[in-house]
Amino acid sequence: PERGLAFDFLADAPAPDGSRGGGAAPATTVALPIGIKVVVAGGFGVGKTTFVSTVSEIEPMSTEELLTEVSAATDRLDGVEDKATTTVAMDFGRITLDPRHVLYLFGTPGQERFSFMWEELSEGALGAVVLADTRRLEASFPAVDFFERRAIGFLVAVNEFDDAHHYRPDEVRAALDLGPEVPVVLCDARVHTSGIEVLISLVHHLIKLRSSHVSEAV
């Protein structure tokens, strides 16, 4: 029932032609899938590329490049000194929820010098996943601030690295100064089912946000 509710909500998302889903398609036409855009953001090296690659049903498109000495001197590598590549534009993946709804994932670059791309990648997004690494929680603040300022619904997914201390969601919430309405979930970006659970949690969060907005408007 919850999954169906999520799909009913998504059916009201704008279609590529600007129309709304949910209605019956004319008998003489073939209904096209509704594209639902979700942004995957977070600091440098938190696992965005891994997350998109793990959950995508297609070969993900990635714009990773080798880190050079120049970029290593520019970007903060604290805690991720062994990282050899970096996303310079975006990661892209796709998940088919049902024949009518397709989820498109756009992973943002993590470095501050590429933050100008976040605006474009977030255009038209229904919601966002902010990945966090408890070894470097401060790297998550720019993404949290970005989505809060633009009133884009988001949740924080703590990517539990093997060598990181594991904190409870309420501890992460307090450290990031998040409001009680923002979900904080734990995940392993390398595990498909874990990533899918994060996305389902995001959809449920967006349903609650939409319901509260409708109630306020009545």
Can you annotate each of these PLM segments?
Residues 111-135, 145-150:
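Inter-motif core of Ras-like GTPase G domains
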